[in-house]
Amino acid sequence: MSGAPPSYSFVALPPRAKDGLVVFGKNSARPRDEVQEVVYFPAVDHDAESKVECTYISIDQVPRTHAIVISRPAWLWGAEMGANEHGVCIANEAINAREPAAETEALLGMDLVRLGLERGTTAKEALDIIVSLLDEHGQGGNYYEDAHSCHSFQSAYLLVDRDEAWVLETVGKYWAAERITEGVRCICNHLSLATKLDEEHPELRTYAQSQGWWTGDDEFNFAQVFSPADDRLDCCAGQDSLEKQEESITVQTMINILRDKASGVCIDSESFLTTASIVSVLPQNRSSPCIHYFTGTPDPSRSIFKPFIFVDDVKLVPKAQSPCFGDDDPAKKEPRFQEKPDRRHELYKAHEWARAVIESDEEQGRTLRKTMLELEKQGLEAMDEILSSPEPPDPAEVGDLFYDCVDTEMKFFK
Amino acid sequence: MDEEYDVIVLGTGLTECILSGIMSVNGKKVLHMDRNPYYGGESSSITPLEELYKRFQILEGPPESMGRGRDWNVDLIPKFLMANGQLVKMLLYTEVTRYLDFKVVEGSFVYKGGKIYKVPSTETEALASNLMGMFEKRRFRKFLVFVANFDENDPKTFEGVDPQNTSMRDVYRKFDLGQDVIDFTGHALALYRTDDYLDQPCLETINRIKLYSESLARYGKSPYLYPLYGLGELPQGFARLSAIYGGTYMLNKPVDDIIMENGKVVGVKSEGEVARCKQLICDPSYIPDRVQKAGQVIRIICILSHPIKNTNDANSCQIIIPQNQVNRKSDIYVCMISYAHNVAAQGKYIAIASTTVETAEPEKEVEPALELLEPIDQKFVAISDLYEPIDDGSESQVFCSCSYDATTHFETTCNDIKDIYKRMAGSAFDFENMKRKQNDVFGEADQ
């Protein structure tokens, strides 16, 4: 069993988060050479009886899917994290549990993130959709684009909307969930649910008893029952980072946490890299828009967060999307992953130049870094104005917002 | 003297020297006189430095820290050349640049909220600048694309704007530009000194913004050029042009009287002799009874031992203080040049603050500019009257130039030249009029 990738997902709710804004963030840790893309899908009506091709399996499509914007490894169908037009954000975490994850191809955790976003109008509704699909189709399959080994994991999810957050942790088809209405919460690559369970699979406890993991006599503690024997249950660098913030949590706070390598929240190791990040701000006041910031490039400490706002005519951003190989994609053929095509998008390639400069040329690197942070700051300031404004933003003005920011960023990368 | 000329020119300011050159190239017999022993008049560069102190009656003269007096060439009128502007066109057509060297001014800055911001000179500089917020920048970019594409002869480029009727205020409104962006556009790009242009038809403003962009594109960095050894080189260059086409120059020649007969000029008397002419060109100082005062300009020449703060140690720059940043009607300008242009001793900088006078306390009016320049080693304060001619010369055939205004470029000067030319020659000025002819006396014709 290989170690689960050390991703971190965060939520802060008012009043712990500032100004009536729910703040959500995730660092996605994945294999170093993997490219993540940022993709927008508009809302679509679907034919009755139609199917949707997820990463490995095909399932029934619903009549209508919501507009979504997601960050995902370019080879798979689902998402590591993302948001929908209704202000729902979802992130997943790969987890090792006592019970090995199925290698049989089914739905990946990433597929369920996307399906939850496409179908749920609230965090709770998305949770119900995910557990229903889990029950119907199960979870399983390779999490990595690797022909030689199957890396499979159980999945946990952080689901957030303007009002509340839910932590959902799943083992096979069994699951437990906790509702969060205040304070801060982080989930990482360990089970974290303990005795406070607001929802659970109806057979969760009987299953645990039947496996001999729970006697039925003591209080049911989900993480204790389902974690591998050698897991250190109380360890979460992200939760520590979040809790020790003395000021109210803002978007900038969240960004700073995601950039922090000393705490281990930002990963740059031999096997894993934080390959993409997201921060979302969800105003409890519904007349303000939700704003979602994506990097689209590896390592948030060397990337900038760029804003996205849902409106009816969002401009597509080809430069942050990887090339599409259609049915010829080695990820779609069996046996899987016999080749590894170049999945780098234009922004990724431009950013490679910037990363090389930052690493090799101290003076030029520092100047470039400073310029990019200044650009990011201007974006954050503009978004703060939108959130402070009594009127919603002009859709014509924000439809090409993410497109423009990607385009601008690339102009600074030779 | 005691000869007959087509045109007599009095005063060797830039305007007069350019007109002298044009007239000579076009076959007129020209006599050019100046009461001073040097070229330039109001637009001269003062050298050595001791002369500047004397001129401003600072009796102790320059301290030793100023270095060799001969290293200094201090302009009395602070201006830069716009790289795609009319004066550069005149220089190129006349090939006067053959005798001159220019440097690109390193930057232009605009004052906002007590600080100065670089006027961006590249796209990435504009994107990185915090002179505007993100959404303002995006609207502004759309506006600039509109201006760049605008062609007054192609209605398809108009986007619903009427160049002769739509006011500039309405164009700004169409692009939803905020007040800060409007100030920046009108004062740092279109280089208007006041806000009167807002209610005028937009064509002139669009053309001015185009001029700025085209000048900027010429050399990068900034849209301005400056001649080594100072602006005084310019009138001399044009005077040389006039001379090689047969123009006669007399410096250090007092003008005792301008002789009129039946309301028409017939000659000039100097030291007892009379030179006769059909037409006369002069600057306002030669005909005080035929000009009227049109305001005042204050210019404060400051010598510094440091670049101006927040200009990235620029050796040369312009700073524009838009008038409503300091509750005035007219902008305040700062032009800074330095030893790098062979106009000052090593390590020294010359910054000149100027504006149109609006109150009885003009020095107080330029204080926001002087604060940007501190510490100042030495200040020279000049308050000049602005004159314009009373008559257009149609009867008198006396054509008087206007005084130099407070702008930091020569476009108004060139407009004055074109206007005088039209009144003298009876036809619109064409830059082709300045092209060298085959018959120049030194055989320097282009083949």
Curated annotation (Swiss-Prot), chain A:
Instruction: Specify whether Cytoplasm is a keyword of the entry.
Output: yes
Question: What is the superkingdom listed in this entry's lineage?
Answer: Eukaryota
The GO annotation for biological process reads: exocytosis; proteolysis; regulation of synaptic vesicle cycle
Pfam families given in the database record: Peptidase_C69
CC terms in the record's Gene Ontology section: cytoplasm; nuclear membrane; presynapse
What's the miscellaneous note? 'Secern' is an archaic English term meaning 'secrete'.
Return the similarity comment.
Belongs to the peptidase C69 family. Secernin subfamily.
Question: Main role?
Answer: Regulates exocytosis in mast cells. Increases both the extent of secretion and the sensitivity of mast cells to stimulation with calcium.
Q: What is this protein called?
A: Secernin-1
Say which species the protein is native to.
Mus musculus (Mouse)
From Swiss-Prot, chain B:
| Gene3D superfamilies the record matches | FAD/NAD(P)-binding domain (3.50.50.60), Guanine Nucleotide Dissociation Inhibitor, domain 1 (1.10.405.10), Guanine Nucleotide Dissociation Inhibitor, domain 2 (3.30.519.10)
Cellular localization per UniProt:
Cytoplasm; Golgi apparatus, trans-Golgi network
Q: Which organism is it from?
A: Mus musculus
Q: Which GO terms fall under molecular function for this chain's record?
A: GTPase activator activity; Rab GDP-dissociation inhibitor activity; small GTPase binding
Name the protein family: Belongs to the Rab GDI family.
Keywords (alphabetical) are:
Cytoplasm, Golgi apparatus, GTPase activation, Phosphoprotein
- At the top level, the lineage of the source is Eukaryota
GO CC list:
axon; endoplasmic reticulum; Golgi apparatus; midbody; myelin sheath; neuronal cell body; presynaptic cytosol; protein-containing complex
Q: Which GO terms describe its biological process?
A: negative regulation of axonogenesis; negative regulation of protein targeting to membrane; positive regulation of axon extension; positive regulation of toll-like receptor signaling pathway; protein transport; Rab protein signal transduction; response to calcium ion
What assembly does the database describe for this protein? Answer: Interacts with RHOH. Interacts with the non-phosphorylated forms of RAB1A, RAB3A, RAB5A, RAB5B, RAB5C, RAB8A, RAB8B, RAB12, RAB35, and RAB43. Interacts with RAB10.
- Residue positions where Phosphoserine is found in the record: 427
Is Transmembrane given among the entry's keywords?
no
Q: In which tissues is it expressed?
A: High expression in brain, lower in other tissues.
Q: What is this protein called?
A: Rab GDP dissociation inhibitor alpha
Q: InterPro entries, per this entry?
A: FAD/NAD-bd_sf, GDP_dissociation_inhibitor, RabGDI
Per the record, the major location class is cytoplasm
Q: What does this protein do?
A: Regulates the GDP/GTP exchange reaction of most Rab proteins by inhibiting the dissociation of GDP from them, and the subsequent binding of GTP to them. Promotes the dissociation of GDP-bound Rab proteins from the membrane and inhibits their activation. Promotes the dissociation of RAB1A, RAB3A, RAB5A and RAB10 from membranes.
